[in-house]
Amino acid sequence: MKIGLASYECRMNDIGFNLKQIEKAIVESKDADLVCFGEAFLQGFAAVTSDYEMDIRMAAEQDSLPIAKIRELSLQYRKAVMVGYIEKDGPDIYSSYALIEGGSVIHNYRRISKNWKNYNITNGNYREGTDTSPFLFHGVEMTVALCGDLWIYPESFRSRGLLIWPVYVNFDLDESESGEYAKQAAMACGKALLVNPLSKEPLSRGGAFF
């Protein structure tokens, strides 16, 4: 299985633009079987304001139109997609990462660490997940961790398979810094794929590493 890491630009609260970027990356991924995007790529990481009324309107349900568009793209181009998004589930909001193939969401990971929002002011409807179990995809054991998950709870992601680690960082991942990320990933898994989106506001410098 060939995996593409899509370090493409996303824009805050511009789902239309970000969906076009997802399609562009899928097309440009050529013979990749799976294309992985960064954390909260659909809406943009800073789309979370920690104002509940604003955020619940911004968040996307699994059966929402934006997710339906990605499901459609997975069918059209016959590729699997992994993408970060701010998820709405009833009255609750999560930072999630969906695996979509053949027009269906086949796995949905919810971030377990709380520092994706201002937890000092958010209400109880901003939730974290609890399930970090590996899953099989095309015969490959995979685990997903979102950004701070792996810094705070590395022991929760130990696996002999492949770790997918979408992040959102606003500094250059130079040799020394990427080395620190590699060390952190190695605490959980021997093989890891890290993907960071590009963004002008707030700044995110991108990057894709194995």
Feature locations, PLM:
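CN hydrolase (nitrilase-like) catalytic-core segments centered on the catalytic cysteine
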Residues: 59-80, 151-210
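Active-site beta-strand/loop signature of hydrolases that rely on acidic residues for catalysis
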Residues: 3, 18, 27-53, 74, ...
